[in-house]
Design a protein with these regions (language model features):
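Extracellular and select intracellular beta-sandwich modules with Ser/Thr-enriched
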Residues: 240, 287-292
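Intrinsically disordered, low-complexity Pro/Gly/Ser/Thr-rich segments with frequent PxxP/GP/PP motifs
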Residues: 225, 230, 235-265, 274-275
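Extended substrate-binding grooves/exosites of carbohydrate-active enzymes
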Residues: 1-211, 215-223, 228-237
């Protein structure tokens, strides 16, 4: 149609009517010839007419790249080179090899479900080259039809296929930055802070030299923003104030001095908050425009709460060890633990007379696929990751004055495929009840990147409260954490769930030092010397993967804790490019360790 002269008048008429209708609307900044309709002689003429009729506005047409490559076309009346969802490498290639027209991301960062995970990377390339115009995130809101309330009180949102229609796009209409009721997704929070108007360029702890960049196009920073600062140590604020007003012109760096007395132990962050100086028609004064955080160097930068959790108990009580053909049982004055010889993992954690485990522990490489996993999911399922389980080939026990060490050679395996992972797993159990895990993991290179790797623990549901130090308060991932900040957070486990209309992986927290699950009487902490991710939920990943709507979900019988070495990135591959290589979990060999510390309050 685009290159068939028989359609010339129809296409011209449509474009002319559009221009005539909207020509006096000052919000129209350029004319687009259409969407996903290819290119040809008819659009050449439509562009020529538009430019002649209204030379004051620029023109764009993303589909100009879909053409007959045996024909030479006229692009002289197109002002922009437009693309939907290009990979960063494609943008760089255009800027290096052509770059004759400004580059417009006419759609990018597809915001379907848990995502997008690549906003920061697009922001960086947009800022790096003056030929980059910016772009339009697809899209604003999830589209669904509300059908009253389910028995659990949740709104029943219907999408493609839910009304019995045979031709539909499923939940592909659920791809916005806000839910159908306009409640923000975590993706909108990510978007907001990525596009904050001010950013820290550098900070020198010794001299106090702070360099900021003003990303505004017209306003001096002194005209629109107050800058507040706070110093936190292991999540607790120890100092705060307001920076002196500084003048920084648009698109410029500015320098100021902020001398700080930096604590010499603990994980210390400087956080800058940018607040609106005065009321605007749509925003109140003191509205937060965004924030930065800077990790400050000191003598001992370890989280001191984590250090205390990791310190060995002074008491040395005897641990009795008994074995059957299937199980190893460890007993001391305060605990009874059991490890399966079939898996090398705990099947019982009884501490101070309380059973902590509802179901056996698992090594875990699966996650409930996100919308952005829709293409990699086929590779994962072809590799049978969703059917993976743990098999122990050798289990040995060594007892010494420090406790009991259980060493296992285990594999993560699945039906009909070769072994996915080889794991040398060591559990060290101290007489105090502390359990330390050490793992050396090797992955078969034939398999694709893993969804995740970690340990999944099905705790007693009475452990319904969580406290953690890491990135929060909302969910955060290796490529989706710019709206989260390091801090000490407390939450009910049920509130850590992000309730996507189409259930999927959610609620993970990135770059954590420890997480604690507890109730009013007892609890357990998971701590590591190296940062990890965790997810605490009342739903299993199998439940999330099976349900088609959030109102169908019913809570499991457990508080499910995933202690993860890493997860694959989130990305925006539901319509955009694959997850960037830097965020893929494709390590062939790695080590992971953590410590579990059960306790009784009082």
């Amino acid at each position: 149609i685009a290159d068939d002269p028989a359609w010339e008048q129809a296409i011209l008429d449509r474009v002319k009517r559009m221009v005539a209708r909207d020509k006096n609307r000052f919000c129209i900044i350029f004319w687009s010839m259409g969407n996903e309709s290819a290119y040809g002689c008819n659009f050449e003429k439509a562009l020529a007419w538009t430019k002649k009729y209204d030379p004051s506005r620029i023109t764009q047409y993303e589909s100009a790249r879909y053409r007959n490559y045996d024909v030479t076309y006229d692009y002289s009346n197109l002002d922009l080179y437009s693309r939907m969802y290009p990979a960063l490498s494609e943008i760089e290639e255009y800027l290096e090899k052509d770059g004759s027209k400004p580059f417009l991301l006419v759609e990018y960062c597809h915001s379907m479900g848990n995502g997008p995970g690549d906003l920061e990377d697009y922001f960086q390339i947009i800022q790096k080259d003056a030929r980059m115009c910016g772009g339009f995130v697809w899209e604003w809101c999830d589209h669904a039809v509300a059908h009253g309330l389910a028995e659990n009180g949740k709104t029943k949102y219907y999408y493609g296929g839910d009304h019995g229609e045979t031709i539909h796009d499923g939940n592909f209409c659920m791809d916005g930055l806000v839910y159908p009721d306009r409640t923000p997704h975590t993706g909108l929070l990510e978007y907001k802070n990525v596009y904050r108007p001010v950013r820290v360029v550098s900070y020198d702890e010794k001299t106090g030299r702070l360099v900021l960049h003003n990303y505004m196009d017209f306003d001096d920073i002194s005209d629109y923003a107050d800058i507040l600062y706070e110093i936190t140590v292991d999540g607790l604020c120890v100092q705060k104030g307001v920076l002196d007003e500084v003048s920084i012109a648009p698109h410029s760096d500015g320098v100021m001095t902020l001398k700080l007395d930096i604590p010499q132990s603990g994980k210390v962050y400087l956080k800058l908050r940018y607040q609106l100086k005065k009321e605007l028609p749509l925003l109140p004064a003191k509205h937060e425009l965004g924030f930065d955080e800077v990790l400050l160097a000191n003598v001992d930068g370890r989280n001191q709460t984590a250090v205390k959790w990791l310190a060995e108990a002074e008491e040395k009580n005897e641990i009795s060890v008994s074995e059957t053909d299937t199980e190893i049982t460890l007993k001391a004055s305060d605990f009874t633990y059991a490890i399966s010889k079939k898996t090398g993992l705990f099947t019982k954690l009884q501490y101070a007379g309380r059973d902590y485990l509802n179901h056996p522990m698992e090594l875990n490489i699966w996650r409930a696929p996100t919308d952005n996993d829709m293409y990699i999911r086929a590779k994962w399922e072809n590799a049978h990751f969703h059917e993976a389980y743990t098999r122990a080939y050798k289990v040995e026990t060594i007892q010494n004055q420090y406790g009991v060490i259980v060493m296992s050679h285990v594999g993560v395996v699945a039906p009909t495929v070769q072994k996915i992972l080889d794991v040398e797993l060591v559990w060290k159990v101290e007489s105090s009840g502390r359990i330390t895990a050490s793992m050396e993991v090797s992955k078969d290179a034939e398999f694709p990147e893993l969804p995740r790797f970690g340990v999944r623990v099905f705790f007693n549901k009475n452990l319904s409260e969580a406290s953690y130090y890491g990135m929060g308060p909302q969910e955060s991932y290796r490529d989706k954490h710019r709206a989260a900040s390091h801090g000490l957070y407390r939450s009910a486990v049920k509130d850590l769930h992000e309730d996507y209309i189409m259930p999927q992986e959610n609620g993970s927290h990135f770059d954590c030092d420890y997480v604690e699950l507890y109730n009013g009487r007892y609890g357990i902490a998971a701590v590591s010397e190296t940062p990890f991710s965790f997810q605490a939920s009342n739903y299993t990943q199998e439940m999330l993967a099976q349900a088609k709507h959030n109102y169908e979900l019913e809570e499991s019988d457990s508080t499910v804790l995933c202690i993860d070495y890493a997860l694959n990135g989130i990305g925006s591959n539901s319509c955009g490019p694959e997850v960037l290589a830097a965020y893929r979990f494709d390590e062939k060999e790695f080590q992971f360790g953590f410590t579990l510390v059960p306790y009784v309050k009082g």
